[in-house]
């Protein structure tokens, strides 16, 4: 099938913003003006077309990123028809995984900012993510109709807080209740949108006299910025020649694609003003799939060999699965971005990460929550496949005869965990299946069974993330669940070496008795033990057993029972029932009885000898220490460091981010002090800081902490 839209006229872009900047409303207006959505959905009524999960509509925040295809010929229908693949991304810090994964497959972005709040906390996080993936972007300053709206203030903040070169393409005519339209600095005309047609119609007019001077100054800055794109243009500009409109657009486009500048538009999505002109900016300034560097990958058999794929229908097929959604009607939907080649429904492709072939059933093009079945997808397309069995987020799907593994997405480790159990026994199996499916959809959500407590532990990116998971269990899978406070995985060990313990288990009361006698020595495992080629392989589960029996004082057949008794005892330590680690036990002496000795008797004797010896060897409780990295604007650095110290954290040093916009604080903090940290850090820094943490090591817990844990235990 021939291409209906040349690839140069594709625009794959995301709509990014801080929570409440009006991103979903902006997306809705895009769908309305591009003719895809006949009735505008309002977030205020919980009816937005793009927010398609019930919870999103209730909470008024966007959780899942919905991919939508739309078409645009320009506000005045003067441009050739372009195909938009739009991804709406969430702005809440608990869902940064959604933003990351959509950025990975996009070519450009529209950054929505609030004209009142300006560069808000989450804007900085999202901006840093966009920098990481080198995503060219334009900005839309929304809510110009709101009290306190100030376009110039936001332009200044982009420079001050984000280090961006903001280039206004428009100026607002009025603000707050008096916001009437915009001045187009390219055409040097005023634009007013017609309210009766919900902004579908508009008219050009002369710039209001009181804005003429400001418009000329802003245009001069815009033209100067464009001229810096090449020496040729700069010479022309400095020589006093006028630059043509097409030259200015092309030059600004070059600089936007190089992420050197951020062109700025303004309006009020709610009042149907400005979104239309911003869409023209998407066509004029954001990249097509052929404007971005070829996608990188590696050879399936040798990951040191780099490969690339061109955005071309004739190249071998390659695509990245970037999201999986469980759909109530068709099951698992795998969203994928095609980087090269073509794919037809019914084709077999290779999942090169898993080394498995997958048959593509139906291919669906998504419009928010509605879908249309299509026969094929081409380079640059974003679509969803039905019926893939082994594909998870971040996997590459490619031609069987031309394998490649595309650069994978990195997902942060979960930072908060809690125990969850079904309210009724009958829901146990259902809950297991449901959690498995949710974990497949969302790589930042993990499920595991705690071997020590038998509890199901769910882990995610924050309290809200896990709240929504529990909520989805109820809504989508009808599983009612109770959630508990998470437990810290403490451990127990000893600090004294060569502690002797002698225990005799003897019961002789007529008939066959029981007799087992062991003498053991307890010591901590040393670095030398771990380096010893003979001993190191025998260290299992951080426990080392050494049989030093000579002369047959304990027959050989009972030695395994002695070890078994010890290994069973260390799974639940004598202090507070946590696993024992880093202990070496040497069996040095004992005795036996010809008739009454048995495996069970020696197992009991070794277990009791261990418990008694452990108590004498100065036992300590160990707590997990997490390596924490916090990225925070400098204004909050003192508060954040103070809080780290209050949490018994040890600062390891600090640094600044590459662009100098934020501080990076590294610290070691006990896990027990980290619960609720995501929420605390958010309120401390107005949501502007982010953190990651990973397990680093265990170390002895302070006496007061150990006593509190043992009381509980």
From Swiss-Prot:
Keywords: Cytoplasm, Elongation factor, GTP-binding, Nucleotide-binding, Protein biosynthesis. InterPro entries: EFG_II, EFG_III, EFG_III/V, EFG_IV, EFG_V, EFG_V-like, EFTu-like_2, G_TR_CS. One of its GO terms (cellular component) is cytoplasm. One of its GO terms (biological process) is ribosome disassembly. GTP binds at residues 17-24, 88-92, 142-145. One of its GO terms (molecular function) is translation elongation factor activity. The keyword GTP-binding applies. Residues 8-290 form the tr-type G domain. Its main location: cytoplasm. It is found in: Cytoplasm. Catalyzes the GTP-dependent ribosomal translocation step during translation elongation. During this step, the ribosome changes from the pre-translocational (PRE) to the post-translocational (POST) state as the newly formed A-site-bound peptidyl-tRNA and P-site-bound deacylated tRNA move to the P and E sites, respectively. Catalyzes the coordinated movement of the two tRNA molecules, the mRNA and conformational changes in the ribosome. Belongs to the TRAFAC class translation factor GTPase superfamily. Classic translation factor GTPase family. EF-G/EF-2 subfamily. This is Elongation factor G. It comes from Stenotrophomonas maltophilia (strain K279a).
């Amino acid at each position: 099938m021939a291409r209906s839209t040349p690839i140069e006229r594709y625009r794959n872009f995301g709509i990014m913003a801080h929570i409440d900047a009006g991103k979903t409303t902006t997306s809705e207006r895009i769908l309305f003006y591009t003719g895809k959505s006949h009735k505008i959905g309002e977030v205020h009524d919980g009816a937005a077309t793009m927010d398609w999960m019930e919870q999103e509509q209730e909470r008024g925040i966007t959780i899942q990123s919905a991919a939508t295809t739309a078409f645009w010929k320009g506000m005045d229908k003067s441009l050739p028809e372009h195909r938009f693949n739009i991804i709406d991304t969430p702005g809440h810090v608990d869902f940064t995984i959604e933003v990351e994964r959509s950025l990975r497959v996009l070519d450009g972005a529209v950054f929505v900012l609030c004209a009142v709040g300006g560069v808000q906390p989450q804007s900085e996080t999202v901006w840093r993510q966009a920098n990481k993936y080198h995503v060219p972007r334009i900005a839309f300053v929304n809510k110009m109709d709101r009290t306190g709206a100030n376009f110039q203030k936001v332009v200044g903040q982009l420079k001050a807080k984000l280090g961006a070169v903001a280039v206004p393409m428009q100026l607002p005519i009025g603000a707050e209740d008096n916001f009437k339209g915009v001045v187009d600095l390219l055409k040097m005309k005023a634009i007013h949108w017609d309210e009766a047609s919900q902004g579908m119609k508009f008219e050009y007019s002369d710039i209001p006299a009181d804005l003429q001077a400001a418009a000329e100054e802003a245009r001069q800055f815009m033209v100067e910025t464009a001229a810096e794109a090449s020496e040729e243009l700069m010479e022309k500009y400095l020589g006093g020649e006028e630059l043509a409109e097409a030259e200015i657009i092309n030059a600004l486009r070059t600089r936007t694609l190089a992420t050197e500048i951020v062109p700025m538009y303004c309006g009020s999505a709610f009042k149907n003003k400005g979104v239309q002109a911003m869409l023209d900016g998407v066509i004029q300034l954001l990249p097509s799939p052929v404007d971005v560097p070829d996608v990188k990958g590696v050879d399936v058999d040798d990951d040191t060999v780099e490969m690339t794929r061109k955005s071309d229908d004739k190249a071998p097929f390659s695509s990245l699965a970037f999201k999986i959604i469980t759909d109530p009607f068709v099951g698992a939907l795998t969203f994928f971005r095609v980087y090269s080649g073509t794919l037809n429904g019914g084709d077999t492709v290779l999942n090169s990460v898993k080394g498995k072939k997958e048959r593509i059933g139906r291919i669906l093009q998504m419009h928010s929550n509605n879908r249309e079945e299509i026969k094929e997808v081409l380079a640059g397309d974003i679509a969803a496949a039905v019926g893939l069995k082994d594909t998870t987020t971040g996997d590459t799907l490619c031609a069987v005869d031309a394998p490649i593994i595309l650069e994978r997405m990195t997902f942060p480790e979960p930072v908060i965990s809690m125990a969850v159990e079904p309210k009724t026994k009958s829901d146990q199996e259902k809950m297991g299946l449901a959690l498995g499916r949710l974990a497949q959809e969302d790589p930042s959500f993990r499920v595991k069974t705690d071997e020590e407590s038998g509890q199901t532990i769910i882990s995610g990116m924050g309290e809200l993330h896990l709240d929504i998971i529990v909520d989805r269990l109820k809504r989508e899978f009808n599983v009612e669940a109770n959630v508990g406070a998470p437990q810290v995985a403490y451990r127990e060990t000893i600090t004294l070496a060569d502690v002797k313990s002698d225990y005799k288990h003897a019961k002789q009361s007529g008939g066959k008795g029981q007799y087992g006698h062991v003498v053991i020595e307890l010591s901590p495992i040393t670095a030398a033990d771990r380096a010893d080629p003979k001993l190191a392989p025998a260290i299992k589960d951080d426990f080392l057993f050494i049989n030093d029996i000579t002369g047959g004082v304990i027959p050989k057949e009972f030695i395994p029972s002695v070890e078994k008794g010890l290994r069973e005892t260390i799974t639940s330590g004598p202090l507070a029932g946590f696993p024992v680690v880093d202990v070496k036990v040497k069996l040095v002496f004992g005795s036996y009885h010809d008739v009454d000795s048995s495996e069970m008797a020696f197992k009991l004797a070794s277990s009791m000898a261990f418990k008694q010896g452990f108590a004498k060897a100065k036992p300590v409780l160990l707590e997990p220490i997490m390596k924490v990295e916090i990225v925070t604007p400098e204004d909050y650095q003192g508060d954040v460091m103070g809080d780290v110290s209050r949490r018994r954290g040890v600062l390891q040093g600090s640094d600044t981010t590459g662009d100098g916009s934020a501080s990076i604080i590294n610290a070691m903090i006990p896990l027990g002090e980290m619960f609720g940290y995501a929420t605390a850090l958010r309120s401390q820094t107005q949501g502007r800081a982010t953190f990651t943490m990973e397990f680093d090591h265990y170390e002895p817990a302070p006496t007061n902490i150990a006593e509190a844990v043992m009381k509980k235990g």
